[in-house]
Amino acid sequence: MYSHNWYLELILKDLKKLGYNITFECLNAVDYGVPQNRERLIVVGHKNNFSFPRKEIKRVCVEEAIGDLMYTTPEDSKFLTKSQDEYIAKYEKASCCKVPRDLHPDRPARTLTCRNLAGATSDMQRVKLKDGRRRRLLHKEAARLQSFPDWFEFSGNETEKFNQIGNAVPPLLAYKVAIAIKESYYDLCTQNTNHHYSEQLTLLEAI
């Protein structure tokens, strides 16, 4: 069901030893308002009943997230060379790729990773411009597709920034899960007047 099952089993075993009930599920960020297909296993240890947030009916597409950016060519744009375009064409033909791996404005993006943001030509996240040229994603575009707000600042050089974006759990997905945890904890606190729970509840007030 999951890769690295041994690691999941270890986490579950240790959480159970600490007295937690365990709920885990593979969530796709696209079901929670993130304009990207991104499956991640989320494990929650709790002392009360817990349910993951309900999936949202409407999915956000690429154009809704970066429509104002994806056909622009800022000074720091990095365009694919002729040899890269030729390599991609051969790669997609050899791998029987029916749909080019460019970003499609009318659908969610495929999973963003460190590798396809900053590295491999064949798997590169890229935008096809109206004049036929293709360029790599900008940091701002990649961040939006991960649901980061425009004001969020990443540190380091270009590769380091892409690594931070590619490795991240989408903030919007994390927020939706945090809200569900908060609701579960509120229910627990109403059932238990223990001072320990009241103190911990203050940590959730900012959510």
Model-derived features: where do they sit?
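Charged helix-capping and loop-helix junction motifs
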Residues: 6-12
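Short, conserved secondary-structure transition motifs
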Residues: 30-34
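S-adenosyl-L-methionine-dependent DNA methyltransferase catalytic core
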Residues: 13-26, 36-207
